[in-house]
């Protein structure tokens, strides 16, 4: 699917390549000198035009000239037929700026009308299979703010990639094996006996959250004291299965209420049951990347970019978590994913080079794995930090957050900053119904537009109020043109956000778009604007509503008709 603005950019790129070829003698470039990768971007400063390129700066070394000289030579060789380019100038150290004929804006609104809910889609992925794994919280407690941010990020990344043509699978890795699960069983055992009236302390390194008290109470209601005597392993196994089923069901329900639905819930234990961990260790051994020391089995991680070698099997014969994680990633590749994306917390930063090294050791392409590292969340209420502590049960859960601020505010606030930035979440702001609350501000723009069309129907007319393409050349006001220009940016914003795995770009874009609409709405009438102009403005606000809704959908936020 090609868009007007993207077509103009592509045309300018082709023209620049043609200019380099034509100017080779003047630039002193022989035929073997490749044209370096360059950009044609929308400049930040409005007075710099509609597009700018850095091509001249990149040719400085091979051409042995100043970038400004190169830029002037390139401009003299530019051929821009039928590209609606009004002016080309050289600015600063050697940027080439392009100003388009203002009439190009006339094609934007009909384009949005044509594509509707599909406006912004691209086929950049070509159907390539992508797996996005996110949250993957231990089933040992409730979902906290870090999990919530990961859920919002991961789901929006998946939505963006799907929107631009990738075949996306959302996956949750269930940590139902290993030490933390053993701790859960022992913690449940303590809560079970406490529910039966016995004095049985929770292990010091166990899980002290009050949620396990409730889980144990429900277990007693169902099974009574049946497991109080007898084989401890049988008792712990029954308690563990009950807790895991309940915890996973609760997680699934919470995430679904947050607007997140997974295609696959993948069990860590299944890697052992199917022998995948053993197969992975055997393959690493066969390829010569394992060795024994002090009774343990080690991976030569240092040979693959790691800062030290890693234990994969302890001296007691039990595989480490890293061993299972390598097997899990091997399984991802073996399932045919072309691109694997993980959303991990900041505490996993050092795990990235180790995992990439392990994949390389197995013979897989480590560059097919991308990891989005997510920084911490701080909650604020009344200007004070709301403290969180998972092990003591005093942290704020995702369920509590949803009850307090609602899904839309939570989803939007969690993607307002890049994953690599710390996030301060102001609970009071998220609940407010003022323009300072960005979610309210954006949704109010959509509701305002919907109100216009309700008024139209109340006057006996059928929405959207025009039966053919209105005369969009009547939209001459600066507020109108600024709004159309920003609407035209949406496909490129989506493509860049998908490429960067950066949903915050869409959060910023849709807030900016809402601001431009409010400015237009406060300055100009729509209904009753006069013959021809009313229809053109109805088309403008209808297209704005389409793009607001498309952008909010990518973020998992609703677009209300009324507020």
Curated annotation (Swiss-Prot):
InterPro entries in the record: aa-tRNA-synth_I_CS (IPR001412), Arg-tRNA-ligase (IPR001278), Arg-tRNA-synth_N (IPR005148), Arg-tRNA-synth_N_sf (IPR036695), ArgRS_core (IPR035684), DALR_anticod-bd (IPR008909), Rossmann-like_a/b/a_fold (IPR014729), tRNAsynth_Ia_anticodon-bd (IPR009080)
HAMAP family noted in UniProt: Arg_tRNA_synth
Enzyme class at the top of the EC tree: ligase
Annotated GO biological process: arginyl-tRNA aminoacylation
Compartment(s) where it occurs, according to its Swiss-Prot or TrEMBL record: Cytoplasm
Entry GO terms, CC: cytoplasm
Keyword Ligase among record annotations: yes
Matches recorded under CDD domains: Anticodon_Ia_Arg (cd07956), ArgRS_core (cd00671)
Enzyme Commission number, as recorded: 6.1.1.19
Catalytic reactions on record: tRNA(Arg) + L-arginine + ATP = L-arginyl-tRNA(Arg) + AMP + diphosphate
Family, per entry: Belongs to the class-I aminoacyl-tRNA synthetase family.
GO MF annotation list: arginine-tRNA ligase activity; ATP binding
Superkingdom of source: Bacteria
Quaternary assembly: Monomer.
Keyword annotations from UniProtKB, A to Z: Aminoacyl-tRNA synthetase, ATP-binding, Cytoplasm, Ligase, Nucleotide-binding, Protein biosynthesis
Main localisation: cytoplasm
Protein name: Arginine--tRNA ligase
Disulfide linkage: none
Motif ('HIGH' region): 137-147
């Amino acid at each position: 699917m090609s868009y007007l603005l993207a077509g103009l950019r592509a045309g300018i790129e082709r023209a620049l390549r043609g200019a380099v070829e034509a100017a080779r003698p003047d630039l002193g470039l022989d035929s073997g000198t490749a044209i370096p990768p360059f950009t044609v971007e929308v400049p930040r400063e409005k007075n710099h035009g509609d597009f700018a390129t850095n091509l001249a700066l990149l040719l400085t070394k091979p051409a042995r000239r100043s970038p400004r000289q190169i830029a002037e030579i390139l401009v003299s060789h530019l051929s821009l037929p039928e590209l609606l380019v009004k002016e080309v100038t050289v600015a600063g150290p050697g940027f080439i700026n392009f100003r388009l004929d203002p009439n190009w804006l006339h094609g934007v609104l009909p384009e949005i009308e044509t594509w509707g809910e599909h406006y912004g889609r691209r086929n950049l992925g070509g159907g390539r299979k992508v797996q996005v794994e996110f949250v993957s919280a231990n089933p040992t407690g409730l979902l906290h703010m870090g999990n919530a941010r990961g859920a919002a990020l991961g789901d929006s990344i998946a939505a963006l990639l799907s929107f631009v043509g990738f075949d996306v699978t959302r996956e949750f890795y269930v940590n139902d094996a290993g030490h933390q699960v053993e701790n859960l069983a022992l913690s449940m055992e303590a809560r079970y006996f406490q529910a039966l009236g016995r004095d049985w302390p929770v292990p010091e390194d166990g899980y002290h959250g009050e949620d396990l008290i409730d889980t144990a109470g429900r277990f007693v209601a169902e099974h009574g004291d049946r497991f109080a005597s007898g084989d401890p392993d049988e008792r712990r196994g029954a308690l563990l299965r009950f807790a895991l089923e309940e915890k996973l069901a609760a997680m699934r329900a919470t995430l679904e209420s947050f607007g997140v639905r997974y295609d696959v819930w993948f069990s860590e234990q299944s890697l052992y049951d199917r022998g995948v961990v053993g197969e992975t260790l055997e393959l690493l051994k066969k390829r010569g990347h394992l060795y024994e020391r002090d009774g343990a089995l080690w991976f030569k991680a240092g040979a693959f970019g790691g800062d030290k070698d890693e234990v994969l099997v302890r001296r007691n014969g039990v595989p480490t978590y890293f061993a299972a994680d390598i097997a899990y990633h091997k399984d991802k590749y073996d399932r045919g994913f072309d691109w694997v994306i993980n959303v991990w917390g900041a505490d996993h930063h050092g795990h990235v080079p180790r995992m990439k090294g392990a994949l390389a050791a197995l013979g897989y392409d480590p560059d097919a794995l991308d990891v989005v590292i997510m920084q911490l969340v701080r909650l604020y209420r009344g200007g004070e930090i709301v403290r969180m502590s998972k092990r003591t049960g005093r942290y704020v859960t995702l369920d509590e957050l949803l009850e307090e601020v609602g899904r839309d505010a939570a989803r939007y606030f969690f993607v307002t900053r890049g994953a690599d930035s710390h996030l301060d979440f102001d609970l009071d702001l998220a609940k407010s119904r003022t323009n300072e609350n960005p979610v309210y501000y954006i949704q109010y723009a959509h509701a305002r537009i919907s109100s216009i069309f309700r008024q139209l129907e109340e006057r006996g007319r059928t929405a959207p109020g025009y039966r053919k393409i209105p005369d969009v050349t009547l939209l001459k006001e600066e507020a109108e043109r600024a709004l159309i220009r920003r609407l035209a940016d949406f496909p490129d914003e989506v493509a860049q956000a998908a490429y960067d795995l950066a949903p915050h770009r869409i959060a910023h874009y849709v807030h900016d778009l809402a601001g431009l609409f409010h400015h237009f709405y406060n300055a100009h009438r729509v209904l009753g604007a006069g013959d021809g102009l009313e229809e053109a403005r109805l088309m403008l606000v209808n297209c704005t509503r389409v793009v607001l809704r498309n952008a909010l959908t990518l973020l998992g936020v609703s677009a209300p008709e009324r507020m």
